[in-house]
């Protein structure tokens, strides 16, 4: 059965009304929800805010082991340290290496672009930061619905966005409703914020419908791989940040590598593009760190 046929047979869907609906419980979506509730409280207004998150919990689909500038966090929560935000590992060193097939050379700091300098930043697990932000959002009265993906954009008769519908549950491989079938619900709102991240499936629909990419440069994307390694204490350099360029890519290929020393003897190693991720591990610059250690997890993003 098609989704429309299922709706015709089992509908109408239950609908819930909110002032603001945010699709996506990542750092951007949660920051928007938190700020809206903060502004409403400052003006003594009641504004209902709901966040729809497809992951089983906030942070479940966050893959980045990132370097974070705390400026935005400070603007959102000036007392984030007292609140226990998981930004505990400041950057202690920052290097950019150009790799060749057999060696490497460190780029002098004076030649490194300002955007690549990480003084005052923190090496974090973004998943942990998102989970903490979700707790803060709920404390402010934000409703978070984890485990529900937005499947369809809903429009008014005039063509304006009025919300989204969640996907049906319990659909068999054939497309027919199964034993645990549950019809999706509609979330209506005065304002809908789409915070799906890059290449969100609803975002692509909206871009096409409203021609948001007309007369714009095409966006470009690359797939990368990140691995989490456990290193011996003697090799750990908590807070050390390393970025690489050059080998194994040629001069016409965009991409590069990163190596972030986290707390607890963990290292986040990644490379964009993913096709070079296994090759770059063999470089002498990385082998000096990766010898006799073990990989805990691997993600593509």
Predicted feature locations:
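Extended hydrophobic secondary-structure segments that form protein cores and membrane-embedded regions
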Residues: 20, 48-56, 189-194
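N-terminal FAD cofactor-binding segment of flavoenzymes
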Residues: 46-103
């Amino acid at each position: 059965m098609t989704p429309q046929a299922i709706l015709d047979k089992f509908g109408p869907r239950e609908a819930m009304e909110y002032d603001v609906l945010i699709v996506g419980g990542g750092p951007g979506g949660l920051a928007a929800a938190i700020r809206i509730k903060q502004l409403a409280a400052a003006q003594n207004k009641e504004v209902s805010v709901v966040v729809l998150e497809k992951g089983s919990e906030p942070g479940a689909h966050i893959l980045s082991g990132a370097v974070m500038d705390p400026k935005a966090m400070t603007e959102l929560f000036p007392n984030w340290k007292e609140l226990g935000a998981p930004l505990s590992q400041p950057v202690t060193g920052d290097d950019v290496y150009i790799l060749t097939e057999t060696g490497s050379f460190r780029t002098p700091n004076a030649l490194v672009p300002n955007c690549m300098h990480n003084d005052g930043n923190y090496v974090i697990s973004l998943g942990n930061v998102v989970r903490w932000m979700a707790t803060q959002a709920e404390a402010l009265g934000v409703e978070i619905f984890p485990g529900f993906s937005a499947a369809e954009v809903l429009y008014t008769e005039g063509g304006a966005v009025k919300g989204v519908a969640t996907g049906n549950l319990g659909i068999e491989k054939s497309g027919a409703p199964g034993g645990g079938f549950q019809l999706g619900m509609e979330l209506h709102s005065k304002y809908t914020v789409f915070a799906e991240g890059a290449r969100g499936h609803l975002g692509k629909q909206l871009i096409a419908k409203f021609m948001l990419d007309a007369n714009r440069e095409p966006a470009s994307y690359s797939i990368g791989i990140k691995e989490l390694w456990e290193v011996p204490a003697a090799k750990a350099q908590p807070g050390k940040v390393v970025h690489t360029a050059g080998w194994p890519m040629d001069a016409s290929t965009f991409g590069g590598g990163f190596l972030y020393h986290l707390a607890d003897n963990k290292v986040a190693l990644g490379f964009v593009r993913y096709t070079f991720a296994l090759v770059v591990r063999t470089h002498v610059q990385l082998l000096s760190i990766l010898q006799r250690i073990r990989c805990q997890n691997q993600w593509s993003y």
